[in-house]
């Protein structure tokens, strides 16, 4: 039996409201706020999978994010919608650098145990070993590179005392992060927010450096300093320098769109094929989601595909997901 741990989806629209698309290449866009088709599909799957394996799911967002969820009918995915992230607008946290600051802020609002799960990641099986406590995250990533430079080279313009924590591990990818120790949760959340606040001045480092440090270096460093057990969901290791994976596949554990986003922007003609993959995976595992998908206005362009995948699954089962990997 899997340990019951509630999860949060976090959607801070601050980056959009600052004129920034929610992707790592920082391409500007105009127009109303919205989530791309593929992210809506993974969001639906993410909420249903977590609920099936581990427990309830809440959305922590702001007024714009809550309005969007309601307009799309996605509010039905959640036990509760909390607009606490409106308070981020009053803080000196630059959304152009800290596009995921909502996750750190949300971690201040709940006591452990709970998980923060990105809307572009869904589980395919329960997360193992949650009863052991500690801090669980998606996977390790290499450090000592342009994304994760040595700690002394990271911009720290607010003067946060980083010597309090032990930076002797790789970076912890936090597309899924499970906080099972409340001391770790509280100290990490405060440290992450303190690092981000007032820390947006000029620097020779890549823009991504500050956001990744605020989460994926600080969280494991705090765990190490407290003696809190930390471990990845998968032993698969992301080598930042070569953008390659090392180690066993995580396909049986979770699916994460992140590494496909750049390809989908570069080759938009691939998006319908990826939608089919996501739809087959979702509708095979959670067939009851089909009616919700057909009711979401932002999914209108793939409504015929939803119907076709439902028919194909009913006729002969899945054709893609059994042999596909993330």
Model-identified regions with their sequence ranges:
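Conserved donor-nucleotide/metal-binding helix-loop-beta segment in metal-dependent transferases, i.e.
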Residues: 124-156
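A conserved donor-nucleotide-binding helix/loop in the catalytic core
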Residues: 37-40, 44-45, 87-117
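Short, flexible, basic/aromatic active-site loop/helix in glycosyltransferases
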Residues: 155-167
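N-terminal anchoring/stem segment of glycosyltransferases
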Residues: 1-90, 260-269, 274-325
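A short acidic (Asp/Glu
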Residues: 20, 68-72, 126-128, 218-222, ...
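Short glycine/proline-enriched coil/turn segments at helix->beta-strand junctions
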Residues: 52-56, 107-114, 131-134
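Hydrophobic/aromatic residue at the end of a short beta strand that borders the catalytic acidic motif
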Residues: 117, 123-124
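Catalytic core and acceptor-binding pocket of nucleotide-sugar-dependent glycosyltransferases
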Residues: 166-263
């Amino acid at each position: 039996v899997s340990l019951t741990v509630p999860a949060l989806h976090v959607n801070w629209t601050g980056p959009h409201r600052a004129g920034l698309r929610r992707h790592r290449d920082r391409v500007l866009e105009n127009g109303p706020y919205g989530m791309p088709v593929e992210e809506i599909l993974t969001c639906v799957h993410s909420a249903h999978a977590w609920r099936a394996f581990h427990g309830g799911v809440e959305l922590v967002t702001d007024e714009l994010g809550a309005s969007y969820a309601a307009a799309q009918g996605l509010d039905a995915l959640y036990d509760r919608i909390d607009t606490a992230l409106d308070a981020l607008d009053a803080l000196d946290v630059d959304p152009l650098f800290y596009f995921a600051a909502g996750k750190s802020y949300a971690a201040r609002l709940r006591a452990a145990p709970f998980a923060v799960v990105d809307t572009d990641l869904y589980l395919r099986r329960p997360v193992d070993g949650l009863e052991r406590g500690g801090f669980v995250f998606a996977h390790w990533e290499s450090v000592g590179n342009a994304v994760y430079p040595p700690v002394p080279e990271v911009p720290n313009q607010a003067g946060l005392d980083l010597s309090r924590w032990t930076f002797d591990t790789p970076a912890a990818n936090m597309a899924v992060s499970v906080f099972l120790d409340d001391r770790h949760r509280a100290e990490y959340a405060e440290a992450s927010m303190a690092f981000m606040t007032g820390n947006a001045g000029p620097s020779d480092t890549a823009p991504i450096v500050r956001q990744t440090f605020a989460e994926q270096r600080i969280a494991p460093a705090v765990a190490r300093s407290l003696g809190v057990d930390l471990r990845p969901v998968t032993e698969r290791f992301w080598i930042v320098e070569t953008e390659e994976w090392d180690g066993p596949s995580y396909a049986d554990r979770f699916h994460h769109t992140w590494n496909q986003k750049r390809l989908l922007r570069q080759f938009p003609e691939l998006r319908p094929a990826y939608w089919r993959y996501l739809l087959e995976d979702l509708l095979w595992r959670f067939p009851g989601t089909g009616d919700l998908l057909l009711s979401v206005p932002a999914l209108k362009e793939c409504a015929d595909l939803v119907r076709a995948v439902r028919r194909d699954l009913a006729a002969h089962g899945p054709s893609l997901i059994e042999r596909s990997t993330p």
